[in-house]
Amino acid sequence: MINPLLRPLLTEKSTGLTEKKGQYVFVVKPDADKTDIKKAVEKKFGVEVKSIRTINCLGKSRAQNTRKGRVTGKKSDWKKAIITLEKGQSIDYYSNTAQKSEG
């Protein structure tokens, strides 16, 4: 698979995971598996991945009333990956580089 990583997911909860546990959250392609995600993270950021958890998120249903009646639709399903790195490693989302701390 060609680069399953779409973008980092920056929310209050994901930022808390990064600060407290050193876990990073990415939105990935729905058909990506853990081995593809691991290879992509290690190649792009130059870090060692300890573990990966993936979550399939269902898109929300939407409805709108119009002159012709009720129109329903659905947002796309998506997938996120929570990535835990080895001790002493971190990812800087903005510079696309990894940093290793001494110790």
Swiss-Prot record:
Signal peptide residues on this chain, from the entry's feature table: none
Swiss-Prot/TrEMBL keywords: Ribonucleoprotein, Ribosomal protein, RNA-binding, rRNA-binding
BP term (GO), one: translation
Subunit comment: Part of the 50S ribosomal subunit. Contacts protein L29, and trigger factor when it is bound to the ribosome.
UniProt similarity note: Belongs to the universal ribosomal protein uL23 family.
Function: One of the early assembly proteins it binds 23S rRNA. One of the proteins that surrounds the polypeptide exit tunnel on the outside of the ribosome. Forms the main docking site for trigger factor binding to the ribosome.
Protein name (database record): Large ribosomal subunit protein uL23
Species in which this protein is naturally found: Pelodictyon phaeoclathratiforme (strain DSM 5477 / BU-1)
Gene (UniProt): rplW
